């Protein structure tokens, strides 16, 4: 079974990952978005109201909410270290879900686990 980041990398339209330097903003809380990400290499801080609530690492995915109906980003994402990200837009996401249904389950699991962790912090 493919890990979700490998799936993202396979189905992204552009062959090259997005590269972010340590401290660089990937997206802001409240910003609209049209891509989800998978960490190929590096670490990303997840912030809510300017506070780091989680650090995610190589092999994890994030940002899928905007592809499944959430209108704007519910958190900010900032590269903690130099980071390479695979990414999918909505069309690529839907194709990946259709071609590899396990990917959809992995995305739902990641999304629900992150939501549960964030709710426990409130």
What are these regions (language model features)?
Residues 1-122:
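Cytosolic regulatory regions built on CNB/CRP/Popeye-like sensor folds
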């Amino acid at each position: 079974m493919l890990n979700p980041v490998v799936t993202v990398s396979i189905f992204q339209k552009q062959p090259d990952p997005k590269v972010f330097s340590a401290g660089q903003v990937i997206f802001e809380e409240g910003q609209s978005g049209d891509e989800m990400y998978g960490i190929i290499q590096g670490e990303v801080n997840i912030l809510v109201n300017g506070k780091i609530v989680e650090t995610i690492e190589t092999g994890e995915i994030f940002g899928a909410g905007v592809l499944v109906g959430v209108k704007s980003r519910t958190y900010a994402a900032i590269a903690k270290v130099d980071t390479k990200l695979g990414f999918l837009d909505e069309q690529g996401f839907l194709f990946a879900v259709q071609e590899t249904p396990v990917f959809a389950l992995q995305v739902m699991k990641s999304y629900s686990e992150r939501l549960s962790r964030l709710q426990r912090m409130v």
